[in-house]
Amino acid sequence: MSIPSLAEALATADTLFDRPTVEAQFVRMGKEIDQALDGERPVFLTVMHGALVFAAQLALAISTDLEFDYVHATRYRGGTTGHELHWLREPAVPLEGRIVLLVDDILDEGHTLKAVRDACLRMGAKRVLVAVMCTKLHGRRAEGIQADFNGVDVPDRYVFGYGMDLNEQARNLPAIYALAD
């Protein structure tokens, strides 16, 4: 798949979810997360860079106190398909005996999220909850990974905006778009 320029992509892309629709999901998810945490302070672990926009807004919708940290692991490296996992930063906060709320932009095939989740468990996390802004609907998910909290479902197309990139661009667009088929 060749990646169009941002201007070309926006001219033909479908707007899947506008800003108010996405933001309404943060409120719902925040309440669900508070209930699941039952007052226990988790490590709020953001997967960079894609989850940055989502994580910041989700954190504001959660009433439970959070300890912030981030990881940087990627499979995409500027492309539209993933390959080998590359670790750029592991958690700095000790995870031993803690609940980890792992926050990412999208659950696609799930290889990155699964690897990060499994690493958190190896580091001693007693429980890892996964929160994603969107889940891509298809049958290629890695075995054993799912979101505990999901904002919206997206079709099996290349999506961008609201933190998700199009060739390292468009992360700050205030809506979720899908490239034209």
Task: Go through each PLM region and give its residues.
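PRPP-associated nucleotide enzymes
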Residues: 1-181
